[in-house]
Structure formats: C-alpha cells, structure tokens
From Swiss-Prot:
One of its GO terms (biological process) is neuropeptide signaling pathway. The lineage of its organism: Eukaryota, Metazoa, Ecdysozoa, Arthropoda, Hexapoda. It is found in: Secreted. The modification Phenylalanine amide is found at residue 15. It comes from Austrophasma gansbaaiense (Gladiator). Keywords: Amidation, Neuropeptide, Secreted. Belongs to the FARP (FMRF amide related peptide) family. This is Extended FMRFamide-12.
Amino acid sequence: SPALDDEHNDNFLRF
C-alpha cells in the first residue's frame, strides 16, 4: 500500500 510505503509515507502522514 502506497500509504504505508516508506518512500511514499507522506500520504500516510498527510492526514
């Protein structure tokens, strides 16, 4: 999942 991907964790933290 991109939301949990280290290289794309900005999506997960964008909340």
